[in-house]
């Protein structure tokens, strides 16, 4: 019965409540071809003639259907009403069905989410809210700060007047305690909705005018003026030219692609093709012309060159069609955030992860949190979750101090629109801070705020100093109870809400975004999956407490540098034509505190400004681990809406035949049968959730229970969380109480929650590699999602990078080990996901991302070859003719031309490009090499490698003191050895040439060039070994002496100074020989 009712929703006009009716061809009338929002013919005609001319739901301009009179602004081809949308957007009936299931699963009697039955009743009563984020449609339960035994700031639900009144503040020095597993006992329920009667009045007025009368304000009606044409605009309507221009602007796209100009990209592509041809000819020459007296060296070099060619192809061709993108924040504001109206922007949950406060200073994390709380976004749409995977009381106390300082910092940022909104970096700027500031009070307020921040730093640093010495009995909280996280490997889950709608106001009486501390449960014997497990715990907690439609994840040292960063992302995610197919929006990583020359290529500009822009022209950039805004639906393992193919050229010329109902059903069945072509790419469709229920209706409790069990098997044993996954536009159940939500939040971060579920395999951050970001993005792309690369003029986020050589190499080692783990796993892009929706060149990029550490082996051999050639007097290339030399010269010219043209279209400087080339060699013969062997040990022998968190401590000993600090690590051994070998080889080669005469200098130049190529690439490494005072550390001196001794013995064995002249045997020739 209810299933039939859900199907009938599409037959009822959502404006006036009348039947939708049929079109001229006898089928159901569809006003909007994009979203299918049910509107009857009279309402459609009224909207086109006297209204906004756009769909009330998706804001798409209405096309003229057959039989409709033309109006001003109609396009010449707007007469075909049969054009289908590119995307199968869900209809209102389907959405209603999903939310009914969600509510029934939770309480069997709930009304929440975007329920079209409720919407219909609102229309009947003259109250219509926004279909997505209106407060009456998708309620957002506000969890107050939770203490150890009670809920502070409880909001009674007896009267609507008290719904939003915050009660009780956290004292300045009296820090709250986290909720562990104590059940508070409040009960409250939110109700109410926002709406207006504008649509109802306008539609009623149009109908009365159509009958010959115009309604007046007092309810009476008058006859229309005689002689007025049907197409004239009535003077009584509120439609005017300004509204027309405004509505036209809201229908414009929120972003657009900006292709690279043909004058820059076409020469680049031509050189790539020419380089590929030259490379093939060069390899053919090398293979067919062996060196007879140095066959092993020749064979080794040819194998290395073939591998380099393959690696170049995998890296180069995904950059074939790079693009830029532009966003239009003014259009976003016109469509979703008009001044004086409730904001309709989507809610966003922001995740910040930290582990060790000794290596990730609390002050750094505090600056990140403060920049989030001060972001330019509606406060009721932002929630910040801080994951403390180390369960440190220091982090908890520092977060409490941060929440207090935020009450002063946030209003200061918003009052004067300062950038950036991380106080440490704002006050450290060496700029004219009075520029563009017209308020007379700014200087005074800025001075006072700087003083407040210095006091805040003193308090936080005092906490850090106190935490250096851990008491024998463990840390004690202010109420005398032991800190639950004293044992970091065995502690319960903890949640504390510091800020929010009932957690106190700022100094100007405004609400602050929600700030939540989360530490997931840890017990011995359970696999916790490091950062990926912590992120999945945050996904579940946020779904239970706030359920924002989108998620932003940041490392604790990456602060928001552009306060409009979330709005930039919403220009893609909330775009009606693009957003539903986007799994995430990735921002480039930018860094502070890097030396001017960027000695170790920390900025990684080539990757962020060239490679990722190239991928954006395909299926989108890879996920790089931070600065990424996710679509929550994509993280839940669902597939994107299916994009239908447009009719072909000949069918459009001949006129496409309209599909009958039978043919439509047939094609639908065909699509369903071919939907899961490859069993290795599991994809879930939102429509699959209703399986077993649609046929029997909601009265069949058994079918509903079976569906709930299947969902709990996938998402875990939490009815509240399962219900939240069905709410496509976010929000939490309206009838849920803070007590029940808190219990569920504690439950979903328990260490055994993920057992026998799809978490980490198909849902959330994917397990199986220390670089969980690559796996997570790859799974989404394999399901058919696309990602977006957003590069605003002002960098969205900035972070810190390890400028010390040893720390930098350890960071690269971790990334490379993750790639090796993926290479030997079932998720390897070489064989995973065929038959899915991953584009061919996108697969190329992922293959390159996983196999690049293997390049370290041929690179190491190729760097040793120059020294061997110089010491033995042999070479890897035979004596070449003038014709053969053309191909060598052509290859070198094509390599340089590719780099130059790449820098030309991307804007990357030659110094950045060269630093990237140098560190490719340094990292390749050190970190990548170790990663290959450690990965093989882990896969074959099960020997796991533990990694320490990269230190993010601030530089307190002077500018770039960390850069010159020498930290010994085994990763330094291979580059040091290769450097010494080549230097010895150069000396030996020159000595041999001096003693052998003029004719030996010709072949020597090729060998010396080869050796200097290696030494020049290792020059930053050599500077790193020398330190600030250009004094080589003792350990390096010892290694140099040891290696020099080895090669001295080798030198004596070869003895290049001995004259090697062969002649006749004197015993055979005699004295007259």
Swiss-Prot record:
Ligand binding (Zn(2+) 1): 13, 16, 40, 43
Chain ranges on the Extracellular side, renumbered to this chain: 292-293, 878-882, 940-969, 1023-1031
Enzymatic reactions: [(1->4)-beta-D-glucosyl](n) + UDP-alpha-D-glucose = [(1->4)-beta-D-glucosyl](n+1) + UDP + H(+)
Positions bound to UDP-alpha-D-glucose: 353, 359-360, 389, 530
Enzyme class: transferase
Ranges annotated as biased composition (Acidic residues): 74-85
Cellular localization per UniProt: Cell membrane
Cofactor: Mn(2+); Zn(2+)
Keyword RNA-binding recorded: no
Protein name, entry field: Probable cellulose synthase A catalytic subunit 2 [UDP-forming]
């Amino acid at each position: 019965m209810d299933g039939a009712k859900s199907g009938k929703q599409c037959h009822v006009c959502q404006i006036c409540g009348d039947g939708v009716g049929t079109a001229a061809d006898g089928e159901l009338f569809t006003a909007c071809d994009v979203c299918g929002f049910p509107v009857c013919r009279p309402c459609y005609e009224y909207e086109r003639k006297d209204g906004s001319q756009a769909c009330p739901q998706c804001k798409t301009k209405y096309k003229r259907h057959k039989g409709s009179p033309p109006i001003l602004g109609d396009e010449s081809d707007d007469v075909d009403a049969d054009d289908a949308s590119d995307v199968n957007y869900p209809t209102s009936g389907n959405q209603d069905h999903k939310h009914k299931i969600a509510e029934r699963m939770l309480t069997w009697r709930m009304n929440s989410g975007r329920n079209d039955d409720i919407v219909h009743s609102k229309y009947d009563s003259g109250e219509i809210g926004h279909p997505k984020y209106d407060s009456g449609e998708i309620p957002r339960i506000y969890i107050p700060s939770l203490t150890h035994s009670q809920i502070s700031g409880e909001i009674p639900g007896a009267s609507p007047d008290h719904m939003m009144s915050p009660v009780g503040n956290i004292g300045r020095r009296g820090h709250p305690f986290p909720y562990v597993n104590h059940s508070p006992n409040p009960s409250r329920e939110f109700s109410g909705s926002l709406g207006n009667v504008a649509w109802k009045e306008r539609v009623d007025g149009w109908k009365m005018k159509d009958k010959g009368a115009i309604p007046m304000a007092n309810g009476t009606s008058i006859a229309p003026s005689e002689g007025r044409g049907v197409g004239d605009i009535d003077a009584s309507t509120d439609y005017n030219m300004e509204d027309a221009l405004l509505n036209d602007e809201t229908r414009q796209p929120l972003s657009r692609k900006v292709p690279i100009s043909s004058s820059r990209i076409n020469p680049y592509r031509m050189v790539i093709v020419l380089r590929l041809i030259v490379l093939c000819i060069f390899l053919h020459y090398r293979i067919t012309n062996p060196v007879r007296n140095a066959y092993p060296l020749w064979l080794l070099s040819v194998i290395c060159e073939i591998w380099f060619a393959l690696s170049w192809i995998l890296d180069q061709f995904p950059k074939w069609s790079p693009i830029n993108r532009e966003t239009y924040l003014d259009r976003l504001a016109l469509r979703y955030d008009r001044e004086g109206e409730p904001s309709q922007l989507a809610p966003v949950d922001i995740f910040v992860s930290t582990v060790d406060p000794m290596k990730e200073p609390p002050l750094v994390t505090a600056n990140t949190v403060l920049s989030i709380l001060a972001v330019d976004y509606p406060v009721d749409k932002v929630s910040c979750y801080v994951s403390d995977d180390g369960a440190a009381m220091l982090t908890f106390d520092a977060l409490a101090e941060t929440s207090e300082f935020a009450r002063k910092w946030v209003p200061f940022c918003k009052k004067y629109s300062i950038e950036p909104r991380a106080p440490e970096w704002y006050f450290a700027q060496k700029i004219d801070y009075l520029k563009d500031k017209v308020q007379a009070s700014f200087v005074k307020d800025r001075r006072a705020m700087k003083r407040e921040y210095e006091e805040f730093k003193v308090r936080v640093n005092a906490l850090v100093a106190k935490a250096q010495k851990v008491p024998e009995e463990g840390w004690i909280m202010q109420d005398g109870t032991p800190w639950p996280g004293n044992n970091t490997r065995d502690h319960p889950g903890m949640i504390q809400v510091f800020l929010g709608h009932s957690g106190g106001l700022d100094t100007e009486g405004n609400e602050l975004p929600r700030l939540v501390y989360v530490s997931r449960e840890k017990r011995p014997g359970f696999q916790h999956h490091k950062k990926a497990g912590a992120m999945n715990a945050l996904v579940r907690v946020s779904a239970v407490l706030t359920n924002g439609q989108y998620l932003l994840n940041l490392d604790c040292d990456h602060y928001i540098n552009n306060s409009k960063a979330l709005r930039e992302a919403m220009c893609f995610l909330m775009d009606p034509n693009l957003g539903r197919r986007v799994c995430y929006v990735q921002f480039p990583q930018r860094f502070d505190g890097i030396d001017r020359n960027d000695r170790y290529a920390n900025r990684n500009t080539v990757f962020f400004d060239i490679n990722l822009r190239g991928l954006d022209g395909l299926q989108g950039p890879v996920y790089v681990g931070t600065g990424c805004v996710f679509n929550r639906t994509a993280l839940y393992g669902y597939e994107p809406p299916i994009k239908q193919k447009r009719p072909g050229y000949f069918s459009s010329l001949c006129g496409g035949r309209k599909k009958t109902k039978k043919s439509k059903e047939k094609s639908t069945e065909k699509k369903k049968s071919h939907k899961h072509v490859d069993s290795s790419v599991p994809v879930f469709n939102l429509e699959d959730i209703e399986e077993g229920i649609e046929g029997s209706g909601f009265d069949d409790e058994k079918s509903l229970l079976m569906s709930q069990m299947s969902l709990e098997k996938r998402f875990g044993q939490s009815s509240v969380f399962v219900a939240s996954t069905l709410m496509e536009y976010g929000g939490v159940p309206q009838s849920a109480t803070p007590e029940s939500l808190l219990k569920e939040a504690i439950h979903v971060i328990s260490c055994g929650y993920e057992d026998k579920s799809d978490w980490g395999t198909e849902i959330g951050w994917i397990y199986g590699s220390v670089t969980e970001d690559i796996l997570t993005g790859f799974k989404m792309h394999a399901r058919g999602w696309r990602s977006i690369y957003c590069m605003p003029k002002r960098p969205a986020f900035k972070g810190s990078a390890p400028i010390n050589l040893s720390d930098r190499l350890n960071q690269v080692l971790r990334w490379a080990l993750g790639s090796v783990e993926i290479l030997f796993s079932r998720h390897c892009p070489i064989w995973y996901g065929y038959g899915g929706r991953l584009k061919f060149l996108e697969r190329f990029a992922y293959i390159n991302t996983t196999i690049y550490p293997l390049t370290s082996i041929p690179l190491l051999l190729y760097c040793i070859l120059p020294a061997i050639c110089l010491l033995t007097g042999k070479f890897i290339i035979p004596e070449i003719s003038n014709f053969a030399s053309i191909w060598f010269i052509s290859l070198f010219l094509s390599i340089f031309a590719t780099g130059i043209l790449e820098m030309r279209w991307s804007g990357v400087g030659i110094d950045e490009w060269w630093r990237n080339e140098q560190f490719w060699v340094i990292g390749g013969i050190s970190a990548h090499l170790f990663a290959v062997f450690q990965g093989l040990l882990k896969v074959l022998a099960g020997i796991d490698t533990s990694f320490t968190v990269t230190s993010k401590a601030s530089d307190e000993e002077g500018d770039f003191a960390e850069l010159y600090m020498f930290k010994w690590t085994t990763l330094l051994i291979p580059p040091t050895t290769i450097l010494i070998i080549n230097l010895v080889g150069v000396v030996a080669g020159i000595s041999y040439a001096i003693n052998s005469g003029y004719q030996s200098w010709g072949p020597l130049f090729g060998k010396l060039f080869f050796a200097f190529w290696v030494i020049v690439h290792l020059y930053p490494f050599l500077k790193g070994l020398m330190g600030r005072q250009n004094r080589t550390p003792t350990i390096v001196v010892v290694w140099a002496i040891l290696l020099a001794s080895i090669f001295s013995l080798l030198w004596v064995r070869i003895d290049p100074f001995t004259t090697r002249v062969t002649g006749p045997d004197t015993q055979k020739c005699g004295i007259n020989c």
